[in-house]
Design a protein with these regions (language model features):
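Gram-negative bacterial Sec-dependent N-terminal signal peptides
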Residues: 1-19
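N-terminal regions of proteins, emphasizing targeting and processing segments when present
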Residues: 10-13, 81, 105-108, 126
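Intrinsically disordered, low-complexity serine/threonine-rich segments
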Residues: 16-17, 99, 108, 113
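N-terminal small/polar-rich segments of proteins
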Residues: 18-94, 124-165
Length: 165
């Protein structure tokens, strides 16, 4: 009788010792893609103003959002509020800017202009329609009070992100 129990006990011991952990992995790719369509250029219509608007000789940057699945993402687009490169400035720069819908792949996306939320220098838009939206960003920098910007290279940056809800 003992001889029959020994193999059974050994079998249970070996079964417990042979346990394994099996990993499960996965990669998630965003269903929202952000692409730069056009870089911006500052025009200098007056000595104290730098502007990306076409009327002022500039070029507005354009960012495209491609949304594969609607209602899961929001766009966060920041307009510049500082130069990342410039000559030394000894006075205040007053910044303004806006984010507007340019082109759309679905007419319902034109509502994004009315539904956006603004805080600090950030525009937040719920991406409620699948497809592509092109956002134009305007930026103006006004230097001091009747002061001319010093000659040199000026650079600022627009940040565009797609955030999962």
């Amino acid at each position: 009788m003992n001889k029959a129990l020994i193999p059974a006990i050994m079998g249970l011991t070996f079964a417990a010792a042979v346990a394994a952990e099996i990993p499960i992995t996965g990669n998630v790719e965003s269903k929202c893609i952000v692409t730069t369509d056009a870089n911006g250029v500052y025009g200098n219509p007056t000595p104290s103003l730098l502007s990306t608007t076409q009327a002022n000789g500039g070029v507005e940057p354009v960012v495209r959002y491609d949304v594969i699945q609607a209602d899961y993402y929001k766009a966060l687009i920041s307009v510049p509020d500082v130069f990342t490169e410039s000559p030394a400035l000894n006075d205040v720069v007053n910044w303004s800017g806006d984010v507007t819908v340019g082109e759309v792949s679905d007419p319902l996306m034109s509502a994004y202009d009315n539904d956006k939320r603004l805080y600090n220098n950030i525009t937040e838009i719920d991406l409620t329609v699948a497809g592509s939206t092109w956002f134009k960003i305007s930026s103006e920098a006004d230097y001091g009070y009747d002061k001319a910007f010093p000659a040199g290279q000026y650079r600022s940056v627009v940040t565009a992100e797609c955030i999962a809800n």
